[in-house]
Amino acid sequence: MSEPLKPRIDFAGPLEVEQNQTLKTQQTFSETQAQTFAPAQVDEPLEDEGQAEAVIDAALRPKRSLWRKMVMGGLALFGVSVVGQGVQWTMNAWQTQDWVALGGCAAGALIIGAGVGSVATEWRRLWRLRQRAHERDEARDLLHSHGTGKGRAFCEKLAQQAGIDQSHPALQRWYASIHETQNDREVVSLYAQLVQPVLDAQARREISRSAAESTLMIAVSPLALVDMAFIAWRNLRLINRIATLYGIELGYYSRLRLFRLVLLNIAFAGASELVREVGMDWMSQDLAARLSARAAQGIGAGLLTARLGIKAMELCRPLPWIDDDKPRLGDFRRQLIVQVKETLQKSKTPREN
């Protein structure tokens, strides 16, 4: 039997002709030049923004030097000396029945105890913030794991930290969807699809509300100093609410550390995205011609607040972003533009009447 005829293949583009490389003239190096020759180092670009952030963060992080260790050792020795001297004063006051000195020692002990307790609480909260980064790395490993037994316990721990009750509908759906034959990757993926969006939706609403308030405040208020104070207060409050939402209790130092990480991430990773998002609106809708200068400043402040909230959400979230579940700045941008336009239209309507 004869073979069937194959269909015709049409080539739309022209055939690529191999280009012969031209040979360069020979260069001869002397023995002295050959001995001192060193190849030039070519700077390789970073693979992604995350690697660039890690390099910058490592460069800005203070290194543990010998002087710092000496200072910490001196402070520890001073603390032990204060405690020992206080015990000796207490014993002497008890033996001599000096009740005034004994009361002073008791008051000092209470103050020192309160200070130690405060330091311990701050350290625990700071440790909890650092532990969230380790949990995110653990979740990333589980999402690439084919083992079994660890995913369910890990997700139950995350639900407990976030304050999600066992009777919550989302958690009940997750329990009904998992079974023993699923591996850790499937269990964690189901948790990210069924339970985690509940917290993410609340965080998105907080970001949207804060961004809208910042936008309207800047667009209406005539005082720049009041605007700056209001925006700073709202941004700090937004970070606190997002951290509390994801089960992280912030202290003084942990709040400063989180705020520093958020600003560092925005400065070195989000500038290009922010410029791109704002530029798309300005070019496509010609907002500079339609809105006043104060309204444009309000939209810019609202976008910065939204960017701040997104980065705080990313740092406090126990799971890495999966697929396209990361909130985009463009979603908040369109909402802010609509709110500013409605506010301007409402302000013009009474004047016309």
UniProtKB/Swiss-Prot annotation:
Keywords: Cell inner membrane, Cell membrane, Membrane, Transmembrane, Transmembrane helix. Coiled coil: none annotated. One of its GO terms (cellular component) is plasma membrane. The keyword Electron transport does not apply. Its main location: membrane. It is a multi-pass membrane protein. It is found in: Cell inner membrane. The keyword Cell inner membrane applies. The chain crosses the membrane at residues 70-90, 99-119, 213-233. HAMAP family: UPF0283 (MF_01085). Belongs to the UPF0283 family. NCBIfam families: hyp_HI0043 (TIGR01620). This is UPF0283 membrane protein CKO_01392.
